[in-house]
């Protein structure tokens, strides 16, 4: 059953909620959040004076880096200046250097991947995401970023294979606490896989994936909510309604308002 545009919108919001709830980071890409923060500070339309000031700052940092190429304070300063200028192409070089100097700080490599994706260097973005996942396989933001990159290029099979391989890797490493892959949040990755199937309107696979996720953690409200959303999309409102209520009862307080909004939307859909 094909949902209306507004219906699809709240379903998508619900899927985003259930996928990223309980995680410690925003779902917004790191680069986007930085740029939006700067724009909200009045930097979206730079005056000539501000442009000149930033250009002078950039030159100063570059002069320091000519003498001290590994000076991280100068690299961070140059990166921040380039971002304030909105010049992502020029931000790549200091980002690459910072990522190289700080291999354990995943934010630099993640920001590099997102910047390359923004400037349509998709091969470079893919390489950066893969490099990050090789050293930090538990980084769900990187996994989601690479998955979305594949999906945006209509590389659906690669996206699904990537997520499935991550689940397999996590399951194999579960008994080895020294393996970084043992830190992968398997339920969240399963929810990501289910979301891909949902967006492809492959509802049987989505439901099966959410069932597996629920079996992994019977106390997690997210697979229950996801199942309800899929059933709602199929027009199975009577089956969906008790699952929405169950998800609401299991969810932490911080997420109940959003779930209640989904339930109200579901009830409106039933009356129509």
Feature locations, PLM:
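Conserved structural position within tetratricopeptide repeats
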Residues: 63-67, 97-100, 130-134, 168, ...
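Canonical tetratricopeptide repeat
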Residues: 77, 111, 145, 192, ...
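Helix-start (N-cap) detector for alpha-helical repeat units in TPR-like alpha-solenoids
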Residues: 72-73, 106-107, 140-141, 174, ...
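Position-specific recognition of the canonical hydrophobic site in helix A of tetratricopeptide repeat
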Residues: 83, 110-113, 117, 151, ...
